[in-house]
Amino acid sequence: MPSPRPVLLRGARAALLLLLPPRLLARPSLLLRRSLSAASCPPISLPAAASRSSMDGAGAEEVLAPLRLAVRQQGDLVRKLKEDKAPQVDVDKAVAELKARKRVLEAKELALQPKDDIVDRAKMEDTLKRRFFYDQAFAIYGGVSGLYDFGPVGCALKNNIIQTWRQHFIQEEQILEIDCTMLTPEPVLKTSGHVDKFADFMVKDVKNGECFRADHLLKAHLQKLMSDKKCSVEKKSEMESVLAQLDNYGQQELADLFVNYNVKSPITGNDLSPPVSFNLMFKTFIGPGGNMPGYLRPETAQGIFLNFKRLLEFNQGKLPFAAAQIGNSFRNEISPRSGLIRVREFTMAEIEHFVDPSEKDHPKFQNVADLHLYLYSAKAQVSGQSARKMRLGDAVEQGVINNTVLGYFIGRIYLYLTKVGISPDKLRFRQHMENEMAHYACDCWDAESKTSYGWIEIVGCADRSCYDLSCHARATKVPLVAEKPLKEPKTVNVVQFEPSKGAIGKAYKKDAKLVMEYLAICDECYITEMEMLLNEKGEFTIETEGKTFQLTKDMINVKRFQKTLYVEEVVPNVIEPSFGLGRIMYTVFEHTFHVREGDEQRTFFSFPAVVAPFKCSVLPLSQNQEFMPFVKELSEALTRHGVSHKVDDSSGSIGRRYARTDEIGVAFGVTIDFDTVNKTPHTATLRDRDSMRQIRAEISELPSIVQDLANGNITWADVEARYPLFEGQETGKKETIEE
């Protein structure tokens, strides 16, 4: 994860904009103030109709039209600057302005959504905490931010989401699953780019040690200064220029800015330390000597890349194939927040699909080609357009999605997310713009879900090209390639160094191996160039691993010959779907949380049966001992059928117990009543959580019915069509033995 990087503070910004009066929302320039000379467009204004209340489609579009126009104009300017090869500083300013206008547009879109489309987060989080879905870890010691423990219900839900993922991807696609260590030696992550690029600048309160992310703090401080009425136009312009380039500043430049603008701790007002680079990985040392630095892995992908040769061999040397891994990853976030959305330890599920770069076609693409889903292309984003619902096949044909392999996985991701409970209407696939792309990706689409925090990334689907395999092959001198049979043999001219092991060994002793490894990987152009130097001067120099070696004619020759090839080596490209399971869980919580009509106190989660923590409850109508043999019989039968269930034989009305099981998302409820005891064959009622409708069936049939419902083999409508609806008991307590 994907490795997935979060969409920062969108929800907070949206909430902030919701609190602002319409007159301020109507002038985003007052919020952003980015007059960037050649890198900005004229200020925009909104109709007076802008308000916090929801409005119909036509009214909303009237409000959004000027914002869309502003984004489109800025996008055109960015393209023109790039075409004209303008100075990079001007391009960066224009891109920063484009991002700012996009944020205003998106915030306004969220503000105009219907009120009934917004979940009551406070009520939902109260339910989650009260029923121990999850809670802050180490709570009795005061807790640690960004770390969470899952309770019985949350753990069951998480396991079911993972098991559904395994069935949907690993079993369906015959993916090779592996389980790699979480401890990773430093050279691996140095090669992958994480050691150098997986970092943010951080400042500390010099008195209490509280940490802040430097760029976020500087931005908030400058925006506060700019909002002061006493701030001059010249000073505002200067600060706007700083904000526009905020992502491009180095450590010393940030330090100078903190001094120039007298930035203090926003909590205490204390002085701050100079910015320091803070790597987001948890560093440790492997072994007692402390000589082998390592990290807790920031993603699960690297373990798959390092085992590529073994996996290729397991697959009989054939491409394409895919490998997957599910496990915990770690990121030492400076200021984690927003519950499960931004945490320090999280579960990922990642797939690495290895494919011949010249054959990026998926044989099963037609299985998903007719899916219609919301796509938000990079082109649409810079044009100020919204996500557009498209047929997946059309998106590939029109070049919106680059190839059918990427398209196939986008379709499969969509089917999985909707299967586990995410609303299709609150799900979109957004393409990364060029300046957003991770260091390893050449194309990337994020599955984003709409939540009370705004749009958040829950799955990344990246085309990593051959970045990782190439990097690890260079670092280890181990070729991470696949062999592709040629249709016809071909003869090629080969030019290679022919070193004298004895002469080189005598001259360079222990370093001889370095020299030999270097000479073995040189290409034809380099060899020809060195041959000329060898003929002219009798020697040439090479440099490897920071050391320089001089080679003479008695140490090396150049050999030329012809070779017939029957196979060619290819470095596979990688398509990587990366799932953040915690974020998926949180989205499922929001998209399935409901309040019963007419009763604000009765809340429930409408989890799909396939992922519900318990598939059904077993509820005796009362504590009458006549019911207990049937409860035991039914519970044992459900266990034999592999159906997770919860017996609730506590005191309290049956309605109250229904409400308790609904609150934790139990999909169905079996009730043992007096008709169960008094009539033969013995029957019981089966209740559907969402509709609250009930049918009556024989006890012997109920385990199979619930099993089929939980596995998705039948629907509740199928059950109602087959069995009579339950209207009420026909017998009562008086016909049974008194309690």
Curated annotation (Swiss-Prot):
The modification Phosphoserine is found at S35, S700. Changing G652A: In CMT2D; shows a large reduction in aminoacylation activity; demonstrates a change in subcellular location pattern; does not associate with granules. It catalyses: tRNA(Gly) + glycine + ATP = glycyl-tRNA(Gly) + AMP + diphosphate; 2 ATP + H(+) = P(1),P(4)-bis(5'-adenosyl) tetraphosphate + diphosphate. The modification Phosphotyrosine is found at Y453. ATP binds at R331, N332, E333, R342, V343, E457, I458, R583. CDD domains: GlyRS-like_core, GlyRS_anticodon, GlyRS_RNA. The modification Phosphothreonine is found at T736. It is found in: Cytoplasm; Cell projection, Axon; Secreted; Secreted, Extracellular exosome. Keywords: Acetylation, Aminoacyl-tRNA synthetase, ATP-binding, Cell projection, Charcot-Marie-Tooth disease, Cytoplasm, Disease variant, Hydrolase, Ligase, Mitochondrion, Neurodegeneration, Neuropathy, Nucleotide-binding, Phosphoprotein, Protein biosynthesis, Secreted, Transferase, Transit peptide. Homodimer. PANTHER family: GLYCINE--TRNA LIGASE (PTHR10745:SF0), GLYCYL-TRNA SYNTHETASE/DNA POLYMERASE SUBUNIT GAMMA-2 (PTHR10745). Belongs to the class-II aminoacyl-tRNA synthetase family. It is linked to Charcot-Marie-Tooth disease, axonal, type 2D: A dominant axonal form of Charcot-Marie-Tooth disease, a disorder of the peripheral nervous system, characterized by progressive weakness and atrophy, initially of the peroneal muscles and later of the distal muscles of the arms. Charcot-Marie-Tooth disease is classified in two main groups on the basis of electrophysiologic properties and histopathology: primary peripheral demyelinating neuropathies (designated CMT1 when they are dominantly inherited) and primary peripheral axonal neuropathies (CMT2). This is Glycine--tRNA ligase.
